[in-house]
């Protein structure tokens, strides 16, 4: 897998007074955070959330909006229960998937020693005491199936010290309904202690509701297996890394249908960040790093033919396509950012093959600022390799003047 080294040269401004002001740390708290909810079931609108920092209350205020996919004025709404079907409901609507934390192991002193009822000390005898900033307090997130009519809940990992979703960053993408609603597919790393902490061997498991049995679908792969998703025809795709213990390995899209497994991106020298099945079940849209940015791609699914999957880059520019919200009749809704713009919703048109901005939550804020200029440069290293460098020039940059320079170099295998 190709590795990238990025360097950003940020040139600090002079503080001169201009018609517009330059960005300050305090200004950052005025930026509205746009988060997509999804395309409505009718397919003609997008629901999204706008979160604004509240400095006085030390909190965040959120509002919901709906906007036509063709463009227009956003409309504030109170909820979207009648607009978007809950994806965690079974196809027949009788059961619902959700996750919650369950106490499994005793870790606190007061749990291990009953005479120390006030002890909040954490006691560990092996690794897996913390992942990033998340401490293992003896509780594990488990997936549950809830009977909508009776409220009865089934813990798919009852009594087991395993996580689903995965800690610390996993979410609802770690568990989905099977196509017929009779089974649940979930991601879990069924290891404990030091073995859990040093392994990347997550697997995708199938839980059958009728027999209450569990089957490991990805037992043959010893690296990460994550993000299971089904096409409208019932084929399952997921993200897979081959090398056990190497959490920055190349991420591929693998498809399983009728017992036949195909790696759609094995021949492609890039790594996949996330993906979504096309409505036609013949293509998969995905996002991946490309030359210092993150772009939108499409790969076809040739099923069981000997044809090499064809990969097409759909977007290109000095911006990142961060996520795919959904497909509508004629295109995709995605989120996009750049070094001068926070997240906004964009519409990708299949015919024009262009991105068009859909939401404009921060336009007034940007228009009040003198923004920096961003330049992309490729520099030859001593060993003849190309190194990407982002040069960020301050607002009102004067090439005849000298400026203090800040060098920011980001390396390591996990840089995008």
Each language-model region and where it sits:
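Bacterial Sec-dependent N-terminal signal peptides
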Residues: 1-23
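Beta-strand-rich domains and repeat architectures in extracellular enzymes and scaffolds
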Residues: 26-60
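Conserved beta-strand position repeated once per blade in WD40 beta-propeller domains
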Residues: 36, 86, 174, 227, ...
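Residue-level detector of Asp-centered blade-edge/turn motifs that repeat once per structural unit
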Residues: 41-42, 91-92, 179-180, 231-233, ...
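Hydrophobic beta-strand positions that form the internal "hydrophobic ladder"
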Residues: 43-47, 96, 184, 234-237, ...
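A flexible loop/linker signature enriched in serine peptidases of the S9 family
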Residues: 50-63, 78-85, 99-142, 159-171, ...
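Short loop/turn segments that connect beta-strands within beta-propeller blades
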Residues: 68-72, 147-151, 208-212, 257-260, ...
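Serine-hydrolase catalytic core recognition
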Residues: 322-416
């Amino acid at each position: 897998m190709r590795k990238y080294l990025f360097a950003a040269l940020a040139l600090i401004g002079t503080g001169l007074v201009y018609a517009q002001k330059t960005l300050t740390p305090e200004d950052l708290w005025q930026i509205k955070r746009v988060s997509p909810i999804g395309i409505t079931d009718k397919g003609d609108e997008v629901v999204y959330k706008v979160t604004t920092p509240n400095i006085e209350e030390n909190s965040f205020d959120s509002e919901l909006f709906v906007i036509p996919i063709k463009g227009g004025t956003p409309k504030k709404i109170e909820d979207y229960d009648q607009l978007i079907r809950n994806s965690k409901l079974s196809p027949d609507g009788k059961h619902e998937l959700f996750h919650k934390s369950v106490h499994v192991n005793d870790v606190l002193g007061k749990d291990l020693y009953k005479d120390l009822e006030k002890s909040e000390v954490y006691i560990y005898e092996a690794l897996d005491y913390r992942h990033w900033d998340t401490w293992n307090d003896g509780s594990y997130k488990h997936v549950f199936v809830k009977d909508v009519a009776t409220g009865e809940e089934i813990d798919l990992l009852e009594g087991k010290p395993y996580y689903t979703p995965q800690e610390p960053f996993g979410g609802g993408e770690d568990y989905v309904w099977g196509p017929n609603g009779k089974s649940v597919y979930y991601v879990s790393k069924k290891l404990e202690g030091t073995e859990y902490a040093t392994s990347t061997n997550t697997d995708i498991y199938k839980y059958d509701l009728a027999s209450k049995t569990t089957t490991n679908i990805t037992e043959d792969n010893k690296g990460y297996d994550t993000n299971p998703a089904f096409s409208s025809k019932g084929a399952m795709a997921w993200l897979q890394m081959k090398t056990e213990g190497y959490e920055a390995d190349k991420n591929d899209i693998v498809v399983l249908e009728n017992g036949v497994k195909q790696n759609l991106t094995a021949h492609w020298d890039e790594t996949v960040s996330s993906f979504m099945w096309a409505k036609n079940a013949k293509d998969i849209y995905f996002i991946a790093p490309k030359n210092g940015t993150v772009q939108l791609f499409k790969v076809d699914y040739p099923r069981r033919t000997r044809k090499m999957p064809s990969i097409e880059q759909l977007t290109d520019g000095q911006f990142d396509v961060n996520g795919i919200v959904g497909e509508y009749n004629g295109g995709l809704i995605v989120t996009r950012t750049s070094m001068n713009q926070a997240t906004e919703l964009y519409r990708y048109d299949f015919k024009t093959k262009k991105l068009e901005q859909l939401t404009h939550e921060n336009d007034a804020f940007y228009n009040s600022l003198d923004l920096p200029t961003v330049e992309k440069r490729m520099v030859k290293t001593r060993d003849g390799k190309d190194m990407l460098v982002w040069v960020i020039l301050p607002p009102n940059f004067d090439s005849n003047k000298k400026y203090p320079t800040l060098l920011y170099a980001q390396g390591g295998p996990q840089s995008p």
